[in-house]
């Protein structure tokens, strides 16, 4: 990946990027990042035409604008080069409607001051950032050739930044961050138990693993950024699934039909990782999402209350899955890519973000009186309306510094939102989903010592060396290890397509 800080200006002269801005310290005002985004994008917010955005980028080339949380994410303004031009052409083909996409530059991650040196003050990413109508922000991945909708408007960008986008949790980004910064050990609450989830087969010679906070037994916490924490019960076999609801209600014929459909969709040997849901005292565990892995380590989920029971990808690797949880299921329909690629990866189909714009444009024509007003007067009136909207976004009383946005202060809105992307708030009550009750029960079992390692491995390896590599490394703590072998792939005929379960 090229260095976005280097390059030439519009006149061929070398561009010297300005000094990188200092990142705020962690203990400062929690609303500082929100206000920083509003300040950085103020001039872009008032741009009425794509050409105005382009001129702004030319004037401020090399400047970094904050993209909100997670802290450190910025867009470095750059005029069009070969990579940006190619990304713009590809993104224009992926967008569902004829929306003008104006490139802003490359997404970068600025490192905190103590971790910077003289040469590596930032981490370059493969994402090109675009701005559409009504301050919509998109990011195009130049490696995997897809685009995500980062935010629908400036308010959403300032509140949530890129935390709702899968691009913030990719392994390639976090691997680079670990290489360029001093490793910081992940901190768990005092006395917390941990569970290591290991994935190892012929496709991953070195293996990969993730660490989760264990509650009790094989129950771990799965956190989805911007949504909340749910209980995930790790499973080893389909027989274990038959002990929980609704799988315990399936007949033998229905069970075979279920697993046949999973095989037909994944088209590889596959593993059961577990289910998310809630325990019920004296009754079966209620499964809400079934989580699977294919032979290559990609993670898929099946939403149990969806009558179609589609198999959908939620992460490329197990490490990404425990980093972002069910983010792609909660904030879904934001990924734009070629249809063949979407079907191959089994991604959610995007939803058009423009379906309300026709009505909005009609109201704008009425508001600005296009037929009667002169063009200059119309633009002046439009800028005046935008100024009023921007002033409203900057009102400090809209937020509580400890609770966040105002909807969290209204008791009438403290409800459980599940996979509702139309809502601006996602309040996940830990008591409703059973996390608090499970933690209280775990507190009474301080003597619980295992299991500590959940393995998704091929114990029946085709080579003796492979079997010894897996078994020997873990045999000394076999009492604390659970295994999950892959389900074999039976030969299937016909075209691979989505098969309803």
UniProtKB/Swiss-Prot annotation:
One of its GO terms (cellular component) is viral tegument. The keyword Hydrolase does not apply. It is found in: Virion tegument. Belongs to the herpesviridae US22 family. Its main location: virion. Keywords: Virion, Virion tegument. This is Tegument protein US24. It comes from the Viruses.
């Amino acid at each position: 990946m090229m260095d976005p800080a280097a390059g030439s200006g519009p006149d061929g002269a070398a561009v010297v990027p300005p000094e990188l801005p200092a990142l705020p310290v962690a203990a400062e005002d929690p609303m500082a990042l929100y206000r920083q985004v509003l300040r950085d994008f103020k001039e872009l917010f008032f741009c009425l035409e794509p050409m105005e955005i382009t001129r702004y980028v030319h004037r401020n080339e090399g400047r970094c604008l904050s993209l909100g949380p997670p802290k450190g994410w910025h867009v470095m303004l750059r005029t069009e080069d070969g990579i940006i031009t190619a990304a713009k052409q590809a993104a224009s083909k992926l967008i569902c409607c004829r929306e003008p996409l104006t490139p802003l530059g490359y997404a970068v991650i600025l490192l905190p001051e103590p971790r910077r040196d003289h040469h590596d003050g930032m981490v370059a990413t493969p994402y090109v950032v675009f701005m559409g109508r009504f301050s919509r922000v998109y990011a195009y991945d130049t490696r995997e050739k897809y685009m995500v909708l980062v935010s629908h408007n400036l308010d959403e960008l300032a509140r949530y930044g890129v935390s709702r986008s899968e691009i913030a949790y990719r392994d390639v980004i976090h691997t680079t961050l670990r290489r360029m910064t001093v490793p910081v050990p992940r901190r768990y609450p005092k006395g917390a138990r941990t569970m290591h989830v290991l994935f190892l087969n012929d496709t991953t010679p070195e293996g990969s693993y993730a660490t989760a906070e264990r509650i009790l037994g094989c129950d771990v916490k799965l956190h989805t950024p911007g949504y909340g924490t749910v209980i995930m019960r790790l499973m080893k076999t389909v027989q274990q699934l038959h002990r929980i609801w609704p799988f315990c209600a399936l007949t033998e014929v229905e069970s075979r039909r279920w697993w046949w459909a999973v095989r037909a969709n994944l088209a590889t040997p596959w593993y059961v990782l577990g289910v998310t849901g809630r325990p019920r005292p004296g009754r079966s565990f209620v499964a809400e999402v079934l989580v699977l892995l294919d032979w290559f380590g990609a993670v898929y989920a099946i939403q149990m209350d969806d009558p179609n029971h589609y198999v959908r990808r939620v992460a490329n690797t197990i490490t990404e899955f425990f980093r972002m949880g069910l983010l792609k299921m909660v904030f879904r329909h934001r990924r734009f890519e070629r249809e063949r690629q979407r079907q191959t990866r089994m991604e959610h189909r995007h939803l058009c973000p423009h379906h309300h714009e026709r009505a909005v444009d009609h109201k704008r024509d009425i508001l600005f009186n296009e037929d009667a007003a002169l063009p200059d007067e119309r633009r002046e009136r439009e800028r005046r309306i935008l100024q009023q909207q921007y002033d409203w976004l900057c009102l400090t009383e809209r937020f509580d510094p400890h609770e966040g946005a105002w909807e969290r202060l209204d008791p009438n809105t403290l409800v459980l939102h599940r996979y509702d992307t139309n809502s601006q708030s996602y309040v996940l009550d830990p008591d409703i989903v059973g996390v608090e009750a499970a933690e209280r029960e775990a507190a009474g079992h301080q003597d619980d010592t295992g299991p500590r390692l959940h393995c998704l491995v091929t114990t029946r390896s085709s080579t003796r060396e492979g079997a010894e590599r897996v078994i020997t490394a873990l045999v000394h703590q076999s009492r604390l290890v659970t295994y999950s072998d892959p389900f074999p792939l039976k030969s299937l005929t016909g075209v691979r397509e989505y098969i309803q379960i």
